[in-house]
Every structure is written in structure tokens, then in C-alpha cells.
Regions:
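Short, solvent-exposed coil/turn linker segments
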Residues: 49, 80, 123, 228-230, ...
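General structural signal for secondary-structure boundaries
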Residues: 6-10, 14-15, 21-27, 38-41, ...
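Residue-level preference for alpha-helix termini and adjacent loops
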Residues: 30, 44-46, 76, 95, ...
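Short, functionally important structural connectors and interaction interfaces within domains
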Residues: 5, 9-10, 16, 29, ...
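TOPRIM fold recognition
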Residues: 32, 130-133, 139-249
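Residue-level signal for pocket-adjacent positions within structured domains
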Residues: 40, 100, 110, 226-229
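TOPRIM metal-binding catalytic domain and adjacent DNA-binding surface shared by DnaG-type primases
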Residues: 1-78, 82-85, 174, 214-215, ...
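Phosphate-handling DNA/RNA-contact segment within nucleic-acid enzymes
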Residues: 53-177, 194
Length: 249
């Protein structure tokens, strides 16, 4: 069943992403693996290098943002954005040639969806089975999948923020005895999400992620680690041994 947008748009984008993920250039595959994503994970996620389809996108806003065929992101990493049940709801494009740039396109109804990067729908089955959930900021911080227990799930929120949809999803699907591990960056933004903060304009307390989750009955632990600003940086400094030392796993 196609939940979120028109059949022709979903078919066009699905075909384009499948083509982009097939026969990856060696340098692209090496880049993704070198950033720490396990091979199983990046293949399950359908990460590719965008190849412009021969036909134009049926979505007008996609054409305006990226060109009729996606010419403006040709060769960029293409990362499907899926709902927890595996339906395609958008795409993220990311440069990998040394320049930093990220561009996103979401279907209109994706606003109702908890937009985590992850191995959907496999991750949902693991959550149903009682696995813990580890949430990081960036997609390459998901390298911690190399060291957490196999039964657990690693997800990325694409930044230091948990939406209402994220919280509702976690509260609904996590098992009562499972734990949520907030593993945001070791910077001010990450710490504010962990501890909460006072809004400068309103002077009101803004709840951190642990407090928000605890209010809906979810056990939340803030992951403490050393040796880098974020898991991706720790990976680049020393691979799996550095991650294990930093996280004591």
C-alpha cells in the first residue's frame, strides 16, 4: 500500500533510488564504509550515488529543488527516507567529495511520520522483539551499530532534536523492559537535549529528551562517552577499538 504520496511519484523515486544503489562506484562504497557504517546497514538502508533517471520527476517541488532529473545532485550520496514500516517518504542527498552539503526532499504527508534514518522495516521488528534503541544525531554516527548488541537498534534523527512524532513512536512500540539510549553529540546542543534548558526569550524550561520520554513511560539513559565530539569522530580516530574504549562496550 502506498501511504504518503502519489503512485507515479513513488514509483519514479523508488526506481531512481534502486538504480542509484546498484553497482556503486568503488570510491563511493569505500567512502561509506570508511565513515563507519557496517556494510549490512548501508545496503539495507539503500544508500547509493544518485544517477539521474531518463524521465523527469513527476513532483514539481522536486524538479524545482534539484532539477527535472535531479541534475543538481548528480553523483551525491542518495539516502532513502522511510517510515518505520518501510514505506518511502523522501530522500536525503549528501556530498561525499570533501565538500559539506546536505539537501532533503520529503513527501508532503511525511510530516506525520517519525523521520529516523535506520534499517526499516528490520529495525521495527527488532523493536517489537524487545531490543533497546540507540539514537544518534548524524547518519555516520550510526557507526555505533558495530559495538552495540545485535538485538538492539541504532537510529539517527538527523540532528539534535526529537519531534513529537519521534516520542510518540518510541512510546508506542518499545517494549516495557527495553531502554532508550540518547547518544547525541558532546557539544552544547547535544547537552541541552539531554538535560533540558531555559528558553532565553520566554524564560520557560524546555524539557530534554529523557524527561519527555520518562513522562510517557520510556526508560531513557544518556550515553556518556569520551574521546571525540561524536561517535563518527571517534570512529575516524581509531575504528572499533576506539568506539569500544569510548563507550565501554
Amino acid at each position: 500500500m502506498l501511504w504518503f504520496f502519489g503512485d507515479c511519484v513513488q514509483a519514479w523515486l523508488t526506481d531512481a533510488l534502486l538504480t542509484s544503489a546498484s553497482d556503486l562506484p568503488e570510491e563511493v562504497e569505500g567512502y561509506v564504509l570508511g565513515r563507519g557504517l557496517p556494510e549490512r546497514m548501508f545496503r539495507n538502508m539503500g544508500i547509493g550515488a544518485w544517477r539521474c533517471p531518463s524521465t523527469e520527476s513527476p513532483a514539481e517541488d522536486f524538479r524545482k529543488k534539484f532539477g527535472p532529473h535531479g541534475e543538481l545532485v548528480q553523483g551525491w550520496l542518495s539516502i532513502p527516507v522511510r517510515s518505520p514500516r518501510g514505506s518511502l517518504v523522501g530522500v536525503e542527498f549528501r556530498r561525499w567529495d570533501g565538500e559539506k552539503a546536505v539537501r532533503k526532499w520529503h513527501a508532503p504527508d511525511a510530516a506525520w511520520c517519525p523521520l529516523f534514518h535506520g534499517e526499516w522495516p528490520l529495525a521495527l521488528h527488532k523493536i517489537w522483539a524487545g531490543g533497546d534503541v540507540w539514537v544518534v544525531e548524524g547518519i555516520f554516527d550510526m557507526c555505533i551499530a558495530r559495538i552495540v548488541p545485535e538485538r538492539d537498534v541504532v537510529l539517527s534523527t538527523g540532528g539534535a532534536a526529537m519531534s513529537r512524532q519521534h516520542v510518540d513512536f518510541v512510546a508506542r512500540f518499545m517494549a516495557p523492559k527495553a531502554a532508550f539510549h540518547l547518544t547525541y553529540d558532546n557539544d552544547e546542543t547535544g547537552r541541552r537535549q539531554a538535560t533540558g534548558f531555559t528558553d532565553e526569550k520566554t524564560q520557560r524550561h524546555v524539557r530534554g529528551v529523557p524527561e519527555r520520554l520518562q513522562r510517557v513511560g520510556v526508560t531513557c539513559h544518556v550515553t556518556r562517552y569520551a574521546g571525540g565530539k561524536d561517535p563518527g569522530e571517534i570512529w575516524e580516530r581509531g575504528g572499533v577499538p576506539a568506539l569500544r574504549a569510548a563507550f565501554r562496550l
